[in-house]
Each structure stands twice: as C-alpha cells, then as structure tokens.
C-alpha cells in the first residue's frame, strides 16, 4: 500500500511540474489551427488599434506603456509579426520568413534561447542580431534584411529596431504562434 501511495504521489508531482521549454514546441494540426486563429484575431486587432495603416517592408508600429506577459504571433501569409502584452496588441511589424524551399515551421513555439548577437553556424556565419531561437534546428526570430516577402532560410527576419525592442520584452519561455 505504501508503495502504491508513493507511486501515485510521484505521478501527481510529476504532472504538476511544468515541462522544460525545450519540450514545449507544438507542431500538431491543433497547434497550427490555433496559430491561424491567433493570426486572424491579430489582423482584426491591428485594424482596431492602429487603423488602416499599411506597413511597408522594414516598418513597424509600437505602443509604449502596454504591460503584461509577452506573446508573439507571426502570420506567414501576411508577412507580419504581432506583439501582445497580456491581451492588448502592443506592436506590429513586417517580417521576411522562409522561402518555399526553406520554409518557416508553423505551430506554437517557446523562445528557447536569446542572444543579443549570434552568428549562424549553418549559413556562412551570417549575423543574427537580437536572436531568439524557436527550435533545435536553428529557426529563430532576429533582425535582418526585410524585402517584404519570404526570403530567409526559415528564420523570421524582423526590422532591426523592432527586433531590439521585442528582444527587450520577451523572455526565454515566451510563446510564439506561427501561422501559415
């Protein structure tokens, strides 16, 4: 009986301990659907919060004074990044995502690591300022060339000033939704 009680207590304890962010990447159909819904909501929130403003490649808008836990939503179809603080849309920026041959993965990702200046180990030591890694294969959000269309090897390139500000508000473990 004591062995059974100990086993049950251990199981309950194990379930109550959050998993490491390294194990929290979700690329299931449900996660991809949730990311699409989040992107649809973000698009509508952008119109409500920032009006009909059309951003050109490399541009962003940012509302200071918005507080709360950060959450990032990436829309690959719109080539846009949306930052929420709590339930409020705080910022929007244009992005450049992966190409058809080097696609950006979709789903729900935690920020696994952050580095103010990183260099790619895969692509000719390419600079990746304000790098925020999203998976174990090297996909990250970082400052980079932003032509307004998919042009990366899978990373999410952000306008440099937006990338620096975003880096300042996110934490390892912050959630990033990436929608097709």
Describe each PLM feature range.
Residues 1-130, 137-180:
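N-terminal pre-domains immediately preceding structured catalytic cores
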């Amino acid at each position: 009986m004591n062995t059974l009680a100990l086993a049950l207590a251990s199981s309950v304890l194990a379930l109550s301990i959050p998993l490491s962010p390294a194990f929290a990447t979700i690329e299931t159909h449900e996660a991809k659907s949730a990311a699409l819904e989040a992107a649809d909501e973000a698009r509508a929130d952008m119109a409500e919060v920032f009006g009909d403003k059309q951003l050109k490649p490399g541009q962003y808008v940012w509302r200071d004074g918005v507080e709360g836990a950060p959450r990032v939503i990436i829309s690959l179809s719109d080539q846009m990044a949306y930052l929420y603080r709590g339930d409020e849309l705080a910022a929007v920026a244009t992005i450049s995502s992966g190409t058809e041959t080097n696609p950006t993965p979709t789903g729900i990702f935690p920020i696994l690591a952050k580095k103010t200046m990183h260099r790619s180990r895969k692509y000719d030591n390419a600079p990746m300022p304000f790098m925020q890694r999203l998976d174990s294969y090297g996909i990250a959000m970082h400052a980079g060339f932003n032509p307004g269309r998919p042009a990366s090897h899978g990373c999410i390139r952000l306008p440099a000033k937006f990338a620096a500000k975003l880096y300042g508000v996110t934490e390892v473990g912050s959630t990033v939704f990436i929608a097709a």
